[in-house]
A protein has these predicted regions:
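Terminal amphipathic alpha-helical/low-complexity segments used for targeting or macromolecular assembly
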Residues: 1-102, 106-107, 143, 149-150, ...
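Structural signal for interior beta-strand "rungs" in well-ordered beta-sheet cores
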Residues: 44, 103-282
Length: 283
């Protein structure tokens, strides 16, 4: 998520009532989950195992629970609960984003009982079938078909375990569906935590498929019914994923790969490979 205005790091430290360490002249231009951070962003980390990954990322400012050596040109916001601080900042700044009513092209067909959220754009010659729910910050390009009762852009399944239970990460991202995508009935595509979940042009998705937050799917890919794709997965172009496949978070399926039905994919799949089984391996 990008801020409407850059925020000086000393203001952020004051807002969070936390210690500031490192470059005190920085301005934050946004706040993002670690998988999608850019220069100028705030990211968070709360486990020593991932400190270095966060410090080496593109993020300029890191929310972290303790002081550690800081790379040049970066800063730390030292807070005992980085997850809570991250959620607080998202909540504080998402309210400043401009929200507009859905914009629907005159040639699009919208069936009864469709819900359209704020900052939704539906382009020419789209068809949105009855009962579909298109949540905030969803961009749908031309020629897209969305089946009955599908939900596009609901919140990410992202929680922090605490002694009292689970706290949800606030989702403020969106979904971008490129031209000529077809999505079947009863599908769910989660929006990004702070970034964008993307479906590439010409991709076809069967009924009852789930796609997790921040996943990136390329062009002309086929996904058959009953698949469950976790968050932050990268799927290339011209991939074929047959029925009831499950995919672990953060893996990559490269171009022209084929995943046979009922496979459980836990590791990256090379370009052009054909995988089957649980855990899936080369055929």
């Amino acid at each position: 998520m990008k801020f409407t205005e850059a925020q000086h790091i000393t203001y952020l430290a004051s807002l969070l009532d936390c210690k500031l360490s490192g470059d005190t002249h920085l301005f934050a231009t946004g706040i993002n989950e670690i998988h999608v951070v850019e220069q100028g962003d705030i990211a968070y980390v709360d486990h020593p195992k991932y400190y270095q990954k966060a410090l080496d990322s593109a993020a300029s400012i890191i929310l972290i629970p303790e002081e550690v050596p800081i790379p040049a040109g970066k800063a730390l916001l030292i807070h005992p609960q980085p997850f809570d601080a991250f959620n607080f900042l998202v909540h504080s700044f998402v309210s400043q984003l401009k929200l507009e009513d859905a914009c629907v092209h005159e040639s699009a067909v919208i069936y009864p009982n469709v819900y359209l959220g704020k900052n939704v754009q539906i382009s020419e010659h789209c068809v949105i079938h009855a009962g579909a729910h298109i949540a905030d910050h969803t961009l749908i390009e031309s020629g897209v078909i969305i089946g009955p009762n599908s939900v596009i852009g609901f919140d990410a399944f992202y929680y922090k375990k605490k002694e009292s239970g689970y706290d949800r990460m606030i989702s403020c991202g969106g979904v971008h569906i490129s031209a000529n995508v077809e999505i079947g009935a009863l599908c769910t595509i989660d929006r990004g935590v702070t970034g964008i979940t993307r479906i590439g042009a010409g991709t076809k998705i069967d009924n009852q498929v789930h796609i997790g937050h921040d996943t990136q799917i390329g062009t002309n890919t086929l996904i058959a019914a009953g698949c469950g794709i976790s968050g932050c997965v990268k799927i290339g172009n011209n991939v074929k994923i047959w029925g009831q496949v499950g995919m672990a978070s953060g893996i990559e399926i490269r171009d022209n790969a084929i995943i046979l039905g009922q496979s459980g994919v836990t590791k990256n799949v090379p370009e052009g490979a054909e995988y089957f089984g649980t855990p899936a391996g080369p055929v």
